[in-house]
Amino acid sequence: MIPEQEEMIPFGADGWHNICKLDIPSFDLGEMQCQIVPLPGHTEGSVGIFIPALRLLLSGDALTPIMCLNFQNHLTKEVQMKTLQCVQQMDFDYYLTSHHDKCFPKALIDRMMKCIEHSYGKKHYAYRYPQPPYAEGYFYLDSVEEEAVGLIVAEMD
């Protein structure tokens, strides 16, 4: 590890104990105001950056259409649903995740909420994340129209 990177957190960090709360509500990005938005679900500390001038939400891993909630640091689908409901109230047109090379329309949030609602009591398929840090869980595929929407959870209900 090079000296400047000693403070970096490796993926799979032991207990994620060295992550702290981001304590700034907004920042100016060269005459463009940005707001920090909490997006818990994928992880407790997930945040997004809302850029009102662009009507865009940068969501990191929190709003991927295949919602991954099966690692030790992931939260429940109930928490994910609350986040989706909050996001639904925001005034944006598109969002960008960290795992895709395209913007998604806000309308996809509705389908993600329906996916969680539909998943209760439905058939899930065994799932195993194929590389370290490996995690097992269950996959529910809700729909495959324009963009596939699904849910991966650690335990079925």
Residue map of PLM features:
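Short, basic/glycine-rich phosphate-binding loops at helix/coil junctions
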Residues: 3-6, 60-64
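A short acidic, helix-capping loop that chelates divalent metal ions and anchors anionic groups
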Residues: 66-71
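Active-site metal-binding loops of divalent metal-dependent hydrolases
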Residues: 41-43, 55, 60-62, 98-100
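Accessory terminal helices/loops
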Residues: 85-94, 101-157
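Metallo-beta-lactamase
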Residues: 1-38, 43, 53, 79-93
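Short acidic loop-to-beta-strand element that houses the catalytic metal-binding Asp/Glu
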Residues: 26, 46-50, 62
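Charged helix-capping and loop-helix junction motifs
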Residues: 73-82, 112-116
